[in-house]
């Protein structure tokens, strides 16, 4: 994206610095449109969209005239200038960081060229805004009249701008590719140099580690074996103690179970004796009550049979 902005703005400024009053007799056809498929680069796609916008401006339609009259084009250009300068500055800093592994002389030269290009870019964009303001005044003066002359001048200017735009963008792409290749080559050389410097240190560290492992490894193994045996003895001791406690708990449980069974037997015998005692208490009472009830019933029945039948009373 940063390469795209640099290519776009530099090429645009190169075309705008040309003479606006160039010869109109050169009516050569416009350069062919570049393909905008998925295989094309992002900057190529944006250049194509920019050229579509320029073609739209060239039509001098009602919308184009309206935007020229209300200074919308100049406002959008101002925003674009600010964003472009930010992108150029960020890209320059990033490229200088990538060129750090290169030689100091080369790095200083490239940095100086980039700073000079950035300064020229700011000056040229300011000039572009002034030219556009002047061109807007001409459009305002000619609106309502015949726009054929204005359209012809704009068509000629756009053809020249198109050529320079493509040429400068291609040149900038090649320059940036060279700088990027130099940065990559310098980075690879720097990494190789660092690797060569670190290789003896790594080998020395590996040798020391092997020696230290030989010297320290055996004592550590002996100590680990002693710890293992000590731990094994403690585990066995703990196991014996745990087994003794389990045996004692099992014995206590057996004693508790025996006592519970004994107490259960005693309670059962006491319950049976209490039941027999209750039976001996209540059985005579029940038999006596049964005899008394039978006698009472017998007396009632006898009284009913012996009573004379009397006629019913008249009062009834």
Curated annotation (Swiss-Prot):
Residues 157-167 are annotated as: LDL and other lipoprotein receptors binding. Keywords: Chylomicron, Endosome, Extracellular matrix, Glycoprotein, HDL, Heparin-binding, Lipid transport, Lipid-binding, Oxidation, Phosphoprotein, Repeat, Secreted, Signal, Transport, VLDL. Residues 277-289 are annotated as: Specificity for association with VLDL. Residues 1-18 form the signal peptide. One of its GO terms (molecular function) is low-density lipoprotein particle receptor binding. It is found in: Secreted; Secreted, Extracellular space; Secreted, Extracellular space, Extracellular matrix; Extracellular vesicle. Homotetramer. May interact with ABCA1; functionally associated with ABCA1 in the biogenesis of HDLs. May interact with APP/A4 amyloid-beta peptide; the interaction is extremely stable in vitro but its physiological significance is unclear. May interact with MAPT. May interact with MAP2. In the cerebrospinal fluid, interacts with secreted SORL1. Interacts with PMEL; this allows the loading of PMEL luminal fragment on ILVs to induce fibril nucleation. APOE is an apolipoprotein, a protein associating with lipid particles, that mainly functions in lipoprotein-mediated lipid transport between organs via the plasma and interstitial fluids. APOE is a core component of plasma lipoproteins and is involved in their production, conversion and clearance. Apolipoproteins are amphipathic molecules that interact both with lipids of the lipoprotein particle core and the aqueous environment of the plasma. APOE exists as multiple glycosylated and sialylated glycoforms within cells and in plasma. The extent of glycosylation and sialylation are tissue and context specific. Glycated in plasma VLDL. Sequence repeats lie at residues 79-100, 101-122, 123-144, 145-166, 167-188, 189-210, 211-232, 233-254. Residues 265-316 are annotated as: Homooligomerization. The modification Methionine sulfoxide is found at residue 142. Glycans are attached at residue 211. This is Apolipoprotein E. Heparin binds at residues 161-164, 228-235. Residues 79-254 are annotated as: 8 X 22 AA approximate tandem repeats. Belongs to the apolipoprotein A1/A4/E family. Pfam families: Apolipoprotein. It comes from the Eukaryota. GO terms for cellular component: chylomicron; extracellular exosome; extracellular matrix; extracellular space; high-density lipoprotein particle; intermediate-density lipoprotein particle; low-density lipoprotein particle; multivesicular body, internal vesicle. Residues 209-289 are annotated as: Lipid-binding and lipoprotein association.
